[in-house]
Amino acid sequence: MSRSVKKGPYVQESLLKKINELNKKGEKKVIKTWSRSSTIFPQMIGHTIAVHDGRKHVPVYISEDMVGHKLGEFALTRTYRGHVNKTEKTTRVSR
């Protein structure tokens, strides 16, 4: 279920404050955050935000296509190594 339109999009206040300060100064720094549930706003375009994935911070460069999505969508928490190939050890030999 999506968030109520009445409430508006969620973004952590401290993250938005840091973005606005950097925009005023005209700087582009990597901003560390643990707030995966924050919605990406248009003010964030062009910044790199390091989103925590559970063990490290993954740098995410914000582009126009990402506006409206959550930060956590771009920092995967699980590593997919592909399906296991069948080998002699994994297959049962019927006798």
Curated annotation (Swiss-Prot):
Pfam families: Ribosomal_S19
Keywords: Ribonucleoprotein, Ribosomal protein, RNA-binding, rRNA-binding
Entries under SUPFAM superfamilies matching the protein: Ribosomal protein S19
GO molecular function: rRNA binding; structural constituent of ribosome
Family matches, as InterPro entries: Ribosomal_uS19, Ribosomal_uS19_bac-type, Ribosomal_uS19_CS, Ribosomal_uS19_SF
GO terms (BP aspect): ribosomal small subunit assembly; translation
PROSITE patterns: RIBOSOMAL_S19
GO cellular component: cytoplasm; small ribosomal subunit
Function: Protein S19 forms a complex with S13 that binds strongly to the 16S ribosomal RNA.
Family per record: Belongs to the universal ribosomal protein uS19 family.
Record's protein name: Small ribosomal subunit protein uS19
Organism whose genome encodes this protein: Clostridium kluyveri (strain ATCC 8527 / DSM 555 / NBRC 12016 / NCIMB 10680 / K1)
Gene this protein is translated from: rpsS
